[in-house]
């Protein structure tokens, strides 16, 4: 059907409103587009900054010196009951030790030629060679008088730790990283078990990891080095570890404490192995022993031995006060052990080759809690 043309006057009356509506629609579109662009700018403007911060975070996390720095991430923890005199950061520590423990061998795995393990708790010493140190003690194998040592350990720490600092405060490392523990649940060891291993999930590195994690959880920025300084050759291991520590100190001058974490080796003439043990909160742990060197004026040059001794005493006092029976007496002797590098350099023996790995892992956690208390002012 053919449409009729509208009269001119009527057609003009429809066209004008249509053009006005079109103009209004166009204006609204322009306004909407401008508003959308402004909103997008507001949303996306922070993204370059966020991307930069993310990249910097990744770069910081990936930074490592050539000696394989590993900054241990702290495990999840929840508040636990603790002595009110301890720093809040230590009171809040639980750090589920179950997260670290390994399956141990049962009796069905015991070989016919298995060796014997003898458990023993080493008490604190008494007599002229021993200086009381809180609930603990110091065994004096030097010519320093007991009165001199007793007076020295009453002095404050020669350094202060910065809690929650972005800069490393503590270095955990291992001169004899390949030292390991027995893997049996019973009091026996297979030939070769509890001697040496390059497996860092089984040797001293595993214990050091627990120590570092616990300190980090307490707000003490801690690095953990897993260099196998005694592999492939045991000879020269202290020269190797000295170079490693010097590299860390040059890169991170904020480090105040260097812990060389080892295990002991105590056995009978017949080859049976002693396991230094104690019980803490219903769980068996390896006992620990701090070794602090002294300058003898000739072959052992440790001009800062007094500062290290103060640190050893504070740590011993803290650990034995928190966990009675956990420590053996501090060994104060003419030993070098690279303890000239800082005023907070110590060696700690965590158990011995007669202990199983789980006892040592638990001891590492307890030792670190005691250290955190000492460093944060709760000793």
Model-identified regions with their sequence ranges:
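A short, glycine/acidic-enriched catalytic loop
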Residues: 190-194, 266-304
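N-terminal Lys/Arg-rich, disordered targeting/topogenic segments
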Residues: 1-15
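N-terminal catalytic or cofactor-binding beta/alpha core of small enzyme domains
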Residues: 20-256, 265-270, 365, 373-379
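Structural recognition of the beta-strand scaffold that forms the well-ordered cores
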Residues: 171-174, 222-224, 257-260, 289-292, ...
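Active-site-adjacent substrate-binding region
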Residues: 304-331
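Alpha-helical scaffolding within the catalytic cores
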Residues: 245, 270-278, 330-336
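Solvent-exposed loop/turn segments at secondary-structure junctions
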Residues: 177-180, 228-232, 263-268, 295-298, ...
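Active-site-adjacent mobile loop/cap segments within catalytic or ligand-binding domains
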Residues: 325-379
